[in-house]
Design a protein with these regions (language model features):
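Residues at the starts of beta-strands that form the adenosine-phosphate
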Residues: 17, 40, 124, 151, ...
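Internal alpha-helical scaffold of NAD(P)-dependent oxidoreductase catalytic cores
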Residues: 146-232
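A conserved regulatory-domain signal marking ACT and ACT-like small-molecule sensing domains
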Residues: 285-369
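Rossmann-like NAD(P)-binding element
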Residues: 66-102
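NAD(P)+-binding Rossmann beta1-loop-alpha1 motif at the extreme N-terminus of oxidoreductases
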Residues: 2-65
Length: 369
């Protein structure tokens, strides 16, 4: 992977005019981010009501028909599902709506192959994938800050023009992302490991919670660990079916390896054997996940603060931390079932933990370190 931010940040300004074709979560978030930068944004969607909702949210102006939009944009962002990328690219190029084109699909080899088959002009096309998202979908879930500090993969082809890469890189930077470069095949193998297979694993675990598998009352004992493991399983099933089907081979390889580890752990537990080796490998893997701003993982001290479940309590806590000069690096809230309180887990640098504890106790909170 080659990071592109340093190469392009001063080389080209953000595109002045952008067409976003597809106004779901990602497309509308791109539009909102660009609008904050003063970019003129045009919106298109097969469902005109969805496009109009995005427009009502301030994402741009609706274009009812791409056939009437010749030359409307410098860059067209194709924010459609993987299976629709090639056809949308062909339609947009036939209508000559932009100089350069990119997409946001989370798989790259299949759309590229289909675009070749359709005879698309690949010299002005930069396959792309912003690695950001939410469990929710649709324009109402969009956020202008969705891409801040997030990796945005660009996968230019041998025939892609350098000016196209520069324009799309500038667009990613304008959205606040950190653009990196990878070839399509490598991209698909890597996202199978870090994105696609984890979604299947989360879905498999979450499926165990549906009747009749889950015993009555068991979910009353659910804690933050279960929520962490299953959170992404709430994603759009239809979209994820497309994603997984488009990257089936690499995802299947990762799942087979995970299944092997789980089967070995099950055999070990059935025979009262030790599973420490797997758990240790898991800890080592977590330690390799990039930390804040994509840098090396850092070790933080977690301070637990009991907070009342009422309006303004969390803001009061943050204000107290700020007044003490403490930067909260991360926060997680665990609610107590049936009780009007929760526990805020505040991650801070070890050298600031003492100051935070003192500030919390002075503010009347119960704390635990």
């Amino acid at each position: 992977v080659t990071r592109l931010a340093g190469q392009a940040s001063g080389a080209m300004t953000a595109p002045a005019r952008v067409l976003v074709a597809g106004t779901g979560l990602i497309g509308t978030s791109v539009a909102l981010a660009l609008r904050e930068r003063g970019t003129e944004v045009w919106l298109s969607d097969a469902d005109e009501a969805t496009a109009r909702l995005a427009a009502d949210l301030g994402a741009g102006t609706v274009v009812p028909d791409l056939r009437d939009a010749k030359g409307i944009a410098d860059v067209a962002v194709l924010a459609v599902p993987p299976a629709a990328v090639a056809a949308t690219l062909a339609h947009a190029q036939d209508s000559a709506v932009a100089d350069w084109y990119t997409d946001v699909a989370s798989v790259k080899e299949l759309p590229v192959a289909q675009a070749r088959d359709l005879g698309c002009d690949l010299s002005c096309y930069v396959p792309g994938h912003p690695l950001a998202g939410r469990e929710r979908h649709g324009p109402a879930a969009a956020r202008a800050d969705l891409f801040l500090g997030r990796t945005w993969a660009l996968c230019p082809l041998p025939e892609t023009a350098p000016d196209a890469v520069a324009a799309v890189t500038a667009l990613a930077l304008a959205c606040g992302a950190d653009p990196v470069r990878a070839d399509p095949a490598t991209h698909d193998r890597w996202v199978a490991l870090v994105s696609h297979a984890p979604h299947v694993v989360a879905a498999a675990m979450a499926a165990r919670l549906a009747p009749p598998e889950v015993p009555p009352g068991a979910l009353a004992l659910a804690g933050q660990g279960l929520r962490d493991v299953t959170r992404i399983a709430a994603g759009d099933s239809d979209l994820w079916t497309q994603i997984l089907s488009a990257n089936a081979g690499p995802v299947a390889e990762v799942l087979a390896a995970v299944a092997g580890d789980l089967a070995a752990a099950a055999r070990a537990l059935a025979n009262a054997s030790d599973v420490t080796e797997l758990l240790d490998r898991g800890r080592a893997g977590v330690a390799r996940i990039p930390g804040k701003h994509g840098g090396q993982p850092r070790s933080f001290t977690v301070v637990q603060v009991v907070i009342a479940d009422r309006s303004g309590e969390l803001a009061r806590l943050f204000d107290a931390a700020g007044a003490a000069g403490v930067n909260i690096e991360d926060v997680r809230i665990e609610h107590s079932p049936g009780l009007p309180v929760g526990v805020a887990e505040l991650s801070v640098r070890p050298d600031q933990a003492g100051a935070l504890l003192d500030a919390m106790e002075a503010g009347g909170w119960r704390v635990r370190r």
